[in-house]
Swiss-Prot record:
This is 2-pyrone-4,6-dicarboxylate hydrolase. Optimum pH for hydrolysis of PDC is 8.5 and optimum pH for synthesis of PDC is between 6.0 to 7.5. The active site is at D246 (proton acceptor). Strongly inhibited by 1 mM Zn(2+) ions. Also inhibited by pyridine-2,4-dicarboxylic acid, 5-hydroxyisophthalic acid and 5,5'-dithiobis(2-nitrobenzoic acid) (Ellman reagent).
Length: 293
């Protein structure tokens, strides 16, 4: 399959945001795809995207006004983290990463990932993206992570309560992708947001990403339901929120977002300079570049 025959899920000419991020701002949730000729996709991949390599990611970073990236291993690459490690290496200190690993990984392999810039592992519970999510094996590997690492968990709101005992048992900090995908049409006091707040209140070391208006708000831009539902959460948990573009927007080929508009959501969910600095600089620095704090 040629590159042009694969899925295009990102805007190739994103607008320039009206909002200017603060100096040192971090895009703390993005991915790279391939290039496939160098980094083949997993045989188990549920989608086959076009190449979206580090040069494209870093050009977007600069275009949007960010200083650093946290690159999350994309599910299409399975547990082979080579593409993500390559992108981190090319960033010359301006990127860190989140790996996806076989739970049987040994300590030497984890140490090598740490040396390569990884600072956590991701557990994915979206059945359309992964075939197996063994909680017992996930807990075992979570107990062997290098010092300072955390676990990123991706799930949808309808299984939050089912996952609570599993998350309670994780022995390291947790970061929740996309707030556990709440139905933002319910508003800030809806059942999904209330359940997510209960989760955040259960542990002081659970963080979240206030991300993906394009995924969570089916009405489309300007994503008013997302802004209305998420702004109170950011205000109430300002020390535990981070943000990212989600570029190159896996599986969003039917509703490709404009990254400039995605960035312009920031002041709507974090309306003060103080909140913006926490979400974009202080908090992700604590998680990913703590040695510089």
């Amino acid at each position: 399959m040629t590159n042009d025959e694969r899925i295009l899920s990102w805007n190739e000419t994103p607008s320039k945001p009206r909002y200017t991020p603060p100096p040192g701002a971090i895009d703390a949730h993005c991915h790279v795809f391939g290039p496939m000729a160098q980094f083949p996709f997993s045989p188990k991949a549920k989608y086959l995207p076009r190449d979206a390599g580090p040069d494209m990611l870093f050009a977007l970073r600069d275009h949007l006004g960010f200083a650093r990236n946290v690159i999350v291993q994309a599910s299409c690459h399975g547990t082979d983290n080579a593409a993500t490690l390559d992108a981190i290496a090319r960033a010359q200190g301006k990127a860190r990463g989140i790996a996806v690993v076989d739970p049987a990984i040994d300590e030497a392999e984890l140490a090598a990932l740490h040396e390569g810039g990884m600072r956590g592992i991701r557990f994915n519970f979206l059945k359309r993206l992964v075939d197996d999510a063994p909680k017992d094996k996930f807990l075992e590997v979570a107990g062997r992570l290098p010092a300072g690492w955390h676990v990123v968990i991706y799930f949808e709101a309808d299984i939050l309560e089912e996952l609570r005992p599993f998350m309670d048992a994780i022995p390291v900090p947790i970061v929740i992708d996309h707030m556990g995908r709440p139905d933002v049409r319910q508003g800030p006091d809806g059942a999904d947001m209330k359940a997510f707040r209960r989760l955040l209140d259960s542990r002081e070391d659970i963080w979240f990403k206030a991300t993906c208006p394009d995924r969570l708000d089916p009405a489309g831009p300007p994503w008013d339901d997302f802004a209305r539902s998420v702004a109170p959460l950011v205000a109430d948990y300002a020390d535990r929120v981070i943000w990212g573009t989600d570029w190159p927007h896996p599986n969003m080929q039917d509703a490709i977002p404009d990254d400039g508009l995605v960035v312009d959501m920031i002041p709507r969910i974090a309306p003060t300079p103080e909140l913006q600095h926490k979400m974009l600089v202080t908090n992700p620095m604590r998680l990913y570049w703590s040695e510089e704090m």
